[in-house]
Every structure is written in C-alpha cells, then in structure tokens.
Amino acid sequence: FRVAVAILGISMAVLACRVPVKGSGAMTTDLQIDAQLGESRWPREAEATRSIADLIARTIEERYPADNRPARRDAHPKAHGCVRARFTVEDTLPENLAQGVFVPGRSYKAWIRFSNGDSDPERPDVLGDARGMAIKLMGVPGAKLLPEESTDETQDFIMINHPVFFIDDPRDYLTLIKRGSSTNPLVKLLAPFALGLKGAMIARAITKKQIVNPLHTRFWSMVPYRLGDDARKQAIKFSARPCVAHANNNIPKDPDPNYLRKAMANTLSTGDACFDFMVQPRRSETMKVEDSKTEWRESEAPFIKVATIHIPKQVFDTDAQMDFCENLSFT
C-alpha cells in the first residue's frame, strides 16, 4: 500500500483554489475565502499549509543531496514526455463559461507533460500508479495570482486519471506526509490511517490504476477551481477526454519499464492525438467545494466541452526535449 509515496505533493497544487493575498515573504498563506462559491476555512489551515510546504522542501533536499542532483519533483517525477499541442476554444460557448482563457475561437500554443505519480522516477510503468496530465498554455495575457509569476503569460491545468482525491483537510495531509516521510518503518505504516476509510479506499483505487497509453486516457482536476472574477464567477472542475474512444485496453505482456513513453511515441510517429477539454460547473450547494473526496455526478452536473486539444504528429522523446520537460513547472 504505497499511499504515502505514490502521490505526495500533488495536493499542494490541487487543494482548494484560493486566491493568495500579497505578503512580505516569497510565500503567503493568507487566504481569501469566497463563501459565495462554497468555500470555507479549515481549522488551522494557514499553519498546516506552511508546514506542508516546509516538509515537502525538506523531503526533496534529503532525497536529493548535493551529490545526487538535479533534484526531481516530489511527486510525478517520472515524465513520459512533454508534447507540443494546440488548445483551441470552441467558437461558441455559454455566457457563463466564455471568460478567462475560454475566449470563444481563441487558440493557444501549449506544452503537455504526461507522468507517473510515484516518487520513484525509475518505477516501471506497469505497476499501478496515478498518471498525470499537466497542460501549460502559452501567450495568455492578464494578471496572475502568484507574485513570482506576475509577468508570466501562461495558464496551467493539472490533472490525474481519477475524478476525486483521497484527502481534503490540510491537517490530515500534514499527518500523512509526516508519517510517510518518517524513517521509522512503524510510523510509515501508520500513514494510510490519516486518510480515514473513504480516503484510503480512494488512494488504493488511484495507486492500482494501470493504463495502456496516456494519449488514450481520461484525466480530471479532482478538485474545483474558480472561473471568473465578476458576477459570473463560479466553481468548476475540468477534465480532458480523448476525442475518440480506444478499444484496446490490454496491458502488454512483459512490457518495457517505460512502455507508456514508447506507446506515446508510437502513436505520434504515425499520426495526431486529440482531447476534448471540458468543464463541469457547480450546480448546487450539495456539490461541496471543500470535499475533494466526493465526485460531482455528471448526471447532475454534465461536463461541457470548451476546447479541443490537438497534439500533432511529432518526435518528443529526444534527450534535449526530455531535459526541457524536466525544467517545465506547473502550478
């Protein structure tokens, strides 16, 4: 049961979509709570957030000492590759969705990184794991929330191949990573108990997942994000789904340890790939913004296609492009 190491760190990117308030330090944990969108503050949330960030930083430093650099990501360190793409917004959209980056008809250059979630970058792909899809749109104008990215013209979307996350309370997450990073084997064994029964079941489902090809896999944001700043602002989740369903879901026999990269390379050596990018607007107060362990049912809140992701035929697995991939960051 690899919960403590399989997806550590990802919740720093996907826990509640807060708006940081400008502070004096490089990182601020002051949070603006938007009750209109269903947000509420967890007890000791700011303190837990600071502790989580500090502990993750220490864990990376310990995992990658000076003689073992460069350091990798704390989670999703194994990249299958970064591919060039084009993100094109639909020509017509409902008024409540036609805001932010979703300007009808607009097209963005993009980079997409596909990955495994486990902290071991050498772990064979055939073993169950969370699989990541991180999209970086280029040429996006407008103010950014993070002070260190205030002049960047980018927009990131971070997803994994599961619709929900295994934890929501930052205090429980802090307990999880403290136990998971402990050098005491007995303490490490206690890590899953920080999740509770429902969280443990979700974590087990996530870390057992096997896939045939990242380009044939659906991905979800797991948690809500805010779309818009004015009276039309709303909480949404998002998802990327292959434009065409693929019938072959059989894991290859005796696969190469990096067979997911090879599968992507084979697909893009002969043709293009495509995803529908969709958003799921929050429809009612029963869809809890702070509950990342409960899925918003599509029967109650259908996903709406807002853009098409076109990945052209290409060679992406060169040493130079893999190095470029390692240097991309997603927030």
Regions from the PLM with identified roles:
Residues 21-331:
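Active-site-adjacent core segments of small-molecule enzymes
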Residues 4-13:
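Bacterial N-terminal signal peptides
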